[in-house]
Amino acid sequence: MLDFEKVIPEDVGISSTGLISFARKLEYNNIPMHSIIVMRHGKICMESYYAPYTRDTLHRMFSVTKSFVSLAIGLLADEGRISLDDHIADYFPEKQPETGVHPYMQMLTIRQMLTMRTCHDKNAYKIGGSPDWVGSFFTVTPDHVPGTNFSYDTASTHTLGALVEKLTGMELLDYLRTKFLDELGFSKEAFILKSPDGKVSMGGSGMCATPQDILKVMYVVSQNGKLGGKQLLPSGYLKEATVKQSDPYGKSGTWEEMQGYGYQFWMTTHNGYAFFGMGGQLAIYYPDKDVILVTTADVQGRQGGVQLIYDAFYEEVYSHIDACTYNGDNSDYEEFQKFENSRQLLVQPGEYSSDLVSKINGQSYEFDDNPCGVTDIKLTFNGDEGTFFYTNATGNHELHFGLGKNVFQNFPDYNFKCGASAAFRADNNLLIKVQIIDSSVGNMYISLSYIDDYVTVMMRKIEESYFTEYDGVFSGKLKN
């Protein structure tokens, strides 16, 4: 079981003040971090969690899951149960149309799927709409010859995960547990969500685990698959998986993502490679400095947010490694410890008091038909907290929020854990930010702008799978 030593940052050549500057830069740029872990030479020098997140909180890892699928495929290949040059269609005859699969699909190999050079330009399950995501991968008409063009295809990785489960007779995470995760002390509570048909682990995006879990796996990968003299993962496969196999340049949104793609691993600048999940779920290894950075966050809706994480780390930490030494003065480290242990989930910035409160407190507004199905709303305030009352198609609901702080609760209708904070963004406007912190990770804005006897409500959800009824703009009038 892996239990990493925690050390003073300067003991491994990293500045305590640099780590503080890194985290503060992210907060200054309004990047909603959930955790940060920095390791060098196998020793942790920073481990910070943003309350209510803790070391033991499971976090949705999104596409970090893809790298775990890759490791499972590598293990199957090492066992001789598959070849990377096998054609995927040969393993799923039961999922194919009666007329047979498209010739492009018949050509597709496991290796091409690992490198995101499939025959689909988009996720097939988003096109087909079927709850059987594996079936849709084979039935949706391909766009192009495989092995040619980089196209980020989550359905492809999901199908590779289904292959692992089909050949092993085990769920994806259970197979990995038996092969190496249990030896690392990977969380027993970790799990992978299922596809809509309830039959297959969501190999493309469904894993919920702790940041420590991800750190442990990346550490073993960084050691060429070896732990304590035992080869847990095939080193030859890892050497191929963690170098550039395909070119995402022009197909990806950030400079880091354009550096290259391996076998479900992203290449980075500074000669690194990464597990990379939507929203800022990262585990990055930099061989040149023997450094691992792990983050969890929610930058969905924050344009360039992931690149800001990379840039802040490079500017404040990476570029100064080995430029400092520990001289016995604990003052910097004591400040660092206080900082490291006092992080909290960011709140909505703005003003936290306004004359608007006296005008709208307890006032009810009613609405005609609108995209969100809201029929009436009311806001009440009590000191630094408030409540948003509303009625929609599912009934009467309450959302509690803080002014300058988060109020934690379960979100109405969905029962997902969330934190809600609000601020006055103009003389006539209140903006509520909801941060979903559950197996779903995302955020939502509810903007209320008042003029005379009218209110305009803007609801915007930034989340992949749920809350579609919380997205729209509509106006209502003060009730008589």
Regions found by a protein language model. Give the residues of each.
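Active-site Gly/Thr loop motif
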Residues: L238-T296
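Active-site-proximal binding-pocket segments
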Residues: D182-T242
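Active-site-proximal alpha-helical segments within enzyme catalytic domains
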Residues: M116, S156-L163, G203-K226, Q281-D298
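Active-site SXXK
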Residues: I20, G42, H59-D85, M113, ...
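Peripheral terminal and inter-domain segments
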Residues: N330-N480
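Structured C-terminal helix/loop/strand segments within mature extracytoplasmic catalytic/sensor domains
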Residues: G277-V347
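A short, well-structured edge-of-sheet supersecondary motif
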Residues: G18-T54, L84, D290-L293
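Active-site helix/loop module of the DD-peptidase/beta-lactamase fold
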Residues: E79-T118, T139, T168-G204, A209
